Amino acid sequence: LLFPLSALPLDGDQPADQPAERMQDISPEQNFWFDLVERGCCTIWNCVQLPGCPCC
């Protein structure tokens, strides 16, 4: 690269360009994984059925 990536203008439509909105998107009401953690998704069967579960 001949120029740093930080020199590129942001177009505003990417999540990284909107940190305030990005922080609002991780509320328990909107995120599927929060409810699973509260209910205890750490059984082997849930980990098999839900690959990528954060508590597995």
From Swiss-Prot:
Proregion span(s): 9-40
Subcellular location: Secreted
Keywords of the record: Disulfide bond, Secreted, Signal, Toxin
Stretch list, region Disordered: 1-22
The keyword Protease appears for this protein: no
Residue stretches spanning the membrane: none
Disulfide bonds: 41-55, 42-53, 47-56
Signal sequence region: 1-8
Primary subcellular site in the record, as a coarse category: secreted
One GO cellular component term noted in the UniProt record for this chain: extracellular region
Known tissue expression: Expressed by the venom duct.
Molecular function terms from GO: ion channel inhibitor activity; toxin activity
Protein name: Conotoxin reg3.9
Originating organism: Conus regius (Crown cone)
